[in-house]
Amino acid sequence: MKYTALIVTFNRLGKLKKTVEETLKLEFTNIVIVNNGSTDGTQAWLSSIVDTRVIVLTLTENTGGAGGFKTGSQYICEQLASDWVFFYDDDAYPYPDTLKSFSQLDKRGCRVFSGLVKDPQGKPCPMNMPFSRVPTSLGDTVRYLRYPGEFIPEANRSMLVQTVSFVGMVIHRDLLTTSLEHIHEQLFIYFDDLYFGYQLSLAGEKIMYSPELLFYHDVSIQGKLIAPEWKVYYLCRNLILSKKIFQ
């Protein structure tokens, strides 16, 4: 199997260096890094990397996470002979055994997986947990606030879910190729991954949450601005305002 890492970065050179360092230790066939118009010396540093697995795509402006992941996905689908693509940000990376764990998974009937993303304290990152059931109404949102366990998977139990996070998603290249249109650049940042995963679910794809696929995410805070309740509110609002996306 050929595995490709897809990383999007913007003006976080310090964290990117650690992400690349850890990624280079893993047996990826290719490592695609999308430089989203960084102005902090990122391009010069990326140009100094000598590992031939690394492919740098440089954009002239910041197109957001959605634009960066779409650019990288298009390149991978058109130019690389890869089987599976691992998505993550410039402040995240897979654990040392994640690729081995993925190779041992039963992939029959499933072309997209969502891993368990942990913060620096070793706790699950709420912002990267998928929804086992998307709250698409006001009633669902209220119930989610009271009973979140009805809408998100248990951290350490494999189960089917309805969304993904672009930190910790592993997707088959064939499925990615036919689903590029569902990475919506206009969303820029936040919810692009939720929309993408939910569209896959609506199309009948099985998304498996697999906690044995561990990712590290160097998030310094888990405050209100990135709490799941905040994401749910805007997700529901955007689902209502953007129904055409799912037609």
Regions found by a protein language model. Give the residues of each.
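A conserved acidic beta->alpha catalytic loop
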Residues: N35-A44, E61, A92-Y93
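Short beta-strand-to-loop acidic/aromatic patch adjacent to the donor-nucleotide binding site
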Residues: A81-D91
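Short, flexible, basic/aromatic active-site loop/helix in glycosyltransferases
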Residues: R133-Q162
